[in-house]
């Protein structure tokens, strides 16, 4: 977390001359500023939003579903920034059998004036990078038959830049490995709703209101169990596991294109050591909690050797830029601080 703190400070310096707000979007299993008391996703023991604000920046932190799909997360981010009732879209909600406009997801807006004349910089970590690109995709397109503020019309120019840190632009082999060896994990998420109204949600909220997983007051546990057991979330592609997989990321990359009017910055990271056989093992700077997944990625035979270098969760090669299924990559170049045009 310390290294990310300094990365954020260096990124912020790029925006020092322009008074454009900065939006922070967390990654997979992330949390908001009012959760995990005393420990911030952005900054650890230091509240990065508060610190950057004290330095003269206008900064806002969104809190989106920690295990939700990028479509759902992007919609949540939009309404948290702009303000209004979250609306996942009629056709998307019908396709995946979710609540289109969940109660409790209506916001005053962190930056209500957001539009093409008042764009934002978006800084992200991990899955947050995919979420930002999905938000950009939704803003740039008009979806026929939709009436929501986000989906009904094109909104070009609303984003000035997108910065990604350790983002699985092309997915992570870890998602594939977990789905293969631990398929029950996604099935278990159906029962996370039982925590929604408990003290646990005050510390960490899975934010799955759209899936209607909450136990009703007059509902017996057996009825609740039967209802939730049949929830489509267990096998749905409207979920982080699909978006973070190599196949899911590739599917999104095929419909996504970068915008020549938007600046993109990607910060690939790693914390492994290469061995003679081209496999990778964790270095001493990596958290012990990430050693097991890091070794799974670093020794996987399901990918080329270049995918073995990783940060414990994502292969470094996947963090650079999006690549489509035909092998075509989005325009990219090595960062030059003297020339960012």
Where in this protein do the model-derived segments appear?
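Sec-dependent N-terminal signal peptides
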Residues: 4-13
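Generic alpha-helical secondary structure signal
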Residues: 8, 55, 228-229
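N-terminal hydrophobic or amphipathic segments with adjacent small-residue motifs
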Residues: 10, 21, 122, 292, ...
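N-terminal non-catalytic accessory region
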Residues: 16-123, 127-186
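Helical cap/lid subdomain of alpha/beta-hydrolase-fold lipid enzymes
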Residues: 137, 141-341
């Amino acid at each position: 977390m310390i290294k990310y703190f300094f990365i954020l400070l260096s990124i912020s310096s790029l925006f020092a001359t322009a008074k454009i707000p900065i939006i922070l979007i967390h990654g997979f299993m992330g949390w908001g500023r009012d959760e995990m008391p005393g420990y911030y996703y952005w900054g650890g023991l230091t509240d990065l939003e508060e610190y950057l604000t004290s330095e003269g920046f206008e900064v806002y932190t969104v809190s989106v579903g920690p295990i939700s799909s990028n479509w759902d997360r992007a919609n949540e981010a939009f309404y948290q920034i702009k303000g209004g009732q979250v609306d996942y879209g009629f056709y998307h909600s019908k396709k995946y059998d979710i609540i289109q406009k969940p109660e409790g997801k209506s916001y005053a807006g962190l930056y209500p004036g957001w539009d093409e004349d008042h764009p934002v910089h978006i800084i992200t970590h991990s899955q947050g990078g995919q979420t930002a690109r999905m938000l950009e995709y939704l803003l740039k397109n008009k979806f026929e038959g939709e009436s929501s503020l986000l989906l009904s019309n094109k909104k070009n120019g609303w984003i000035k830049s997108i910065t990604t840190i350790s983002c699985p632009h092309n997915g992570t082999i870890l998602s594939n490995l977990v789905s293969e060896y631990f398929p029950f994990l996604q099935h278990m998420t159906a029962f996370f709703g039982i925590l929604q109204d408990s003290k646990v949600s005050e510390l960490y909220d899975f934010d799955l209101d759209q899936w209607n997983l909450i136990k009703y007051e007059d509902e017996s546990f057996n009825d609740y169990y039967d209802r939730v057991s049949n929830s489509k979330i267990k096998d749905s592609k409207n979920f982080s596991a699909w978006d973070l997989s190599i196949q899911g990321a590739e599917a999104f990359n095929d419909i996504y294109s970068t915008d020549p009017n938007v600046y993109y910055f990607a910060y690939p990271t790693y914390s492994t050591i290469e061995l003679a056989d081209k496999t990778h093992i964790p270095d001493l700077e990596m958290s012990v909690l990430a050693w097991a997944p890091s070794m799974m990625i670093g020794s996987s035979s399901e990918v080329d050797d270049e995918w073995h270098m990783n940060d414990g969760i994502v292969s470094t090669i996947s963090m650079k830029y999006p690549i489509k299924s035909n092998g075509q990559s989005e325009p990219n170049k090595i960062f030059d601080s003297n020339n960012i045009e």
